[in-house]
Every structure is written in C-alpha cells, then in structure tokens.
Amino acid sequence: MIANSRCIACILSKQERKIRKNSDEQKKKEYIHKVLKILYEYGTKECAPMVEKRIKDIYKEYYEEDVDYAALKHRYNQYMLEKEEEIRAHIQKNNDIETCIKYVCAGNYIDFGLANKIDDQLLQGLLDKVNELKISKKEVAYLEDELAQAKTLLYITDNCGEIVLDKIFIEELQNKYKNLQITAMVRGGIASNDATMEDAEEIGLTNVVPVIGNGAAIMGTVKEQLSEEAKEKIQNAEVIIAKGMGNFESMYQEEMNPYYLLLCKCELYKETFGVEMFQPIFCKEERL
C-alpha cells in the first residue's frame, strides 16, 4: 500500500521528535531536509515501512541510535513471558480461537515504531479486558473453515513481547488442526522493536514451529526486499496470518491476501476500518 499524505506527515513528525533534543540546529536542519527529500522521492510510490527504512539509513549518517531496542525488546519479551501461563489458562478456559485472536491483537499495542513509549497500564488493561474487545465472529468462522481445509499456514509476526501471544496462538492452532504445517516468519534484521530470530529464540517460538527470517530489516513485509525463502513460503502458503500495521501497510494490495490481525493505534486506521482506538482489526484482505 502506497503511503498516503497522513502517513507521510506522521513519518516527518516522528523524525522531528526523534532529533528534537539534539543541540546542533544546523545538523538537525540538514537531516530534516534529507528526510523531506526521501519523502518527496519515494513517498508517492512506496509503502511507509520501505520509506522509513530509507530514512533509517540516512539517520545513521547523522546520529547514533538513540533507543536501545535490544533492552526494550528483552524487557517486553520477559514482561509477556511472565503473563504467559495466566493468559494460556484463560484461553483454554474459553476454548476458542476468538479469544486467541483478541489476545494477539491486544498485544499489538507493544509498538515503539508508532509510539515514543509504551504505557504499561494501558497494555495491562487491554490484556485484562480482552473479553470486551470486539471482532467479527463471521471472520473467525471463515478463518476456522480455511484452516480446517489447509495443509500450510504462514504466520508473520510483528513486535517483540506480543510474539509470546503469537506463540500461544500457534500452539492452540496446532492442537486444533493436527494436519496443519505452520511456519512463523520474523524480520530479517533489527527494525525498531519488531521481532527477529533472536526474539523468537528468547520466548521459545523456535521450539514450537520452524521460524524463518524474511531477509530484510524493515518494519514490514516488502515483497521486493524479501529473501527467496520468504517469497517461496508466502507463495506456497494456503493461509497467511499477518500481524500489525507494518505488515498491513507493506502487504496490502500486493496479491498475498492474508488475514490481518492488529490493534487500531492511529486516527487513520480508526477512520479506515470504522473501529475505535485500541480495538482489534481482524479481516482477510479479499473482504476489505
């Protein structure tokens, strides 16, 4: 999906906030001009995650990384691992896929690519009130029918922390669909707080299903940047589940037709999908 005007404005605003505390005004102006050039050249023909990757490369020329994502990722991986058994018990009590989907959407709140920081109280509130989240029961039924007939599922993860919920969901799918071969795909390199192979290993996902990197350090799944292995997995998967905004922005209208699972975290998505802030978005592309 090509970045629209509001995405472009959001990207620019994030970059200005990112460098605001730097004291060298001339350096800041030069950097912002470089950002504007990238937005002008690529903002009308590429998705937001790809544009942000180009900006990230320019940022490295001017500044050292100002966020220790390794520490943040470890913190939220451990934060969610501590809640794993409680969440698993709640899912098993409800004994349905719908509850799993609500949890993985709630966990999508853990997104440093969009927010400057995570409100732990808000995150806990989303997890505590997961039964109050609304998703389409009809869409759940569609997914269940497809999984019952499919032999292969590709599950594309998004952020750290929430990958623990992805693991629980995948295990529930394994229990329900015994003949379903599931592969998980993570980012191929560091991209904000997105989950990589290191995160998959830390939270135990690699002990549950085969996990592959997508070949790119981008906050999404950009077809042209994927490894041949990742392209092959996408092409051959009978069902694809794609988590998060970055995957939606990079996969929509790219002939992959996944089920999108994410949390509404911005006004554009609120208006586009007709949902309230911090409510789940769950749908298959062909029915959007």
Residue ranges and their predicted role:
Residues 2-150:
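Electropositive, gly/pro-rich neighborhoods at or near active sites that engage anionic ligands
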Residues 158-167, 189-191, 245-249:
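Gly/Ser/Thr-rich loops at beta-strand to alpha-helix junctions
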Residues 186-187, 200-288:
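C-terminal functional extensions of proteins
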Residues 152-158, 183-185:
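Short glycine-rich or small-residue beta-strand-to-loop segments that form or flank ligand, phosphate
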Residues 160-178, 182-183:
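Histidine-anchored nucleotide/phosphate-binding helix
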Residues 182-199:
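Short connector loops at secondary-structure junctions
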Residues 150-152, 179, 237:
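A general structural motif
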